[in-house]
Amino acid sequence: MMSSAPETFSLDHLSQHQQQQPPPLAEQEQLCYVHCNFCDTILAVGVPCSSLFKTVTVRCGHCANLLSVNLRGLLLPAAASTANQLPFGQALLSPTSPHGLLDEVPSFQAPASLMTEQASPNVSSITSSNSSCANNAPATSMASAANKATQREPQQPKNAPSANRTSEKRQRVPSAYNRFIKDEIQRIKASNPDITHREAFSAAAKNWAHFPHIHFGLMPDQGLKKTGIQSQDGAGECMLFKDGLYAAAAAAAAATAASSMGVTPF
């Protein structure tokens, strides 16, 4: 009897101690409303108070779409209006709770001030970048126009030399060789009417090659002797140059000297 009494006392003491301890309270939840952008449905969501400053994932019961909701941003009215979640922010301050959520969270003002301080430099930087872009837009357009103008300018002088060249070709005086060949062909045909033009041209070319004084501008009276040429008519006739040949050679030499000095002979 003496040994069993303390045991019963201890059991009774434990049972009384368990009865005195209150049952664990369920975690308090806040009823919030989330708008589903996919099916345009308002969802009633119970968010634990410990997760009010976190980003939670909500599954829509109507379309099974997953929504990522930032509860920290919804606490600010400005963030709630920008995120189109104003009903959710109003639900946090709804009269269902005995007192507002802002009263339950005394450290709420600190995040708000930090977020406003962080937002103001971002806004100022965005406005400054927009203004700088607006100021630089006319400068870039003017620079591009100047570059296009400089690219088009070099194309104009390219066409000018070609026009000058064509005019020079049109105004060019026949060379001494051409004048000599022309006069020589006429002389050979006059002396031998039966000769062909091809044979006369060949004979004129040989005459030009056999008289170097024509190339160097020498006059025929400087000790050169008369030579004969053989025509290409197959008869093997030998023709001697007359005074007209020397006159033509002298005229060709004079034309060559005048053209080298830049003076038109005729």
UniProtKB/Swiss-Prot annotation:
Compositionally biased region (Low complexity): 119-141
GO molecular function: zinc ion binding
C4-type ZnF: 36-63
Listed Polar residues bias regions: 142-165
InterPro entries assigned to the protein according to its UniProt record, in alphabetical order: HMG_box_dom_sf, YABBY, YABBY_C, YABBY_N
UniProt region (Disordered), positions on chain: 1-22, 119-174
Name of this protein: Protein YABBY 5
Source organism per UniProt: Oryza sativa subsp. japonica (Rice)
